[in-house]
């Protein structure tokens, strides 16, 4: 995932997995 901004989208994507 791309979350260079640290906006939490990566965390959401991981939880969605």
Curated annotation (Swiss-Prot):
List GO molecular-function terms, semicolon-separated.
ATP binding
Is ATP-binding given among the entry's keywords?
yes
Q: Give me the Gene Ontology terms describing cellular component.
A: chloroplast
**Highest taxon in the source lineage:** Eukaryota
Alphabetized UniProt keyword annotations = ATP-binding, Chaperone, Chloroplast, Nucleotide-binding, Plastid
Compartments, as annotated in UniProt? Plastid, Chloroplast
- Keyword set includes Chaperone: yes
Additional detail: This protein shows ATPase activity.
**Subunit relationships:** Oligomer of probably six alpha and six beta subunits.
Function (record text):
This protein binds RuBisCO small and large subunits and is implicated in the assembly of the enzyme oligomer.
Q: Family assignment? A: Belongs to the chaperonin (HSP60) family.
Recorded protein name is RuBisCO large subunit-binding protein subunit alpha, chloroplastic
> The organism's lineage?
Eukaryota, Viridiplantae, Streptophyta, Embryophyta, Tracheophyta
């Amino acid at each position: 995932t791309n979350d260079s901004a640290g906006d939490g989208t990566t965390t959401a994507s991981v939880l969605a997995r």
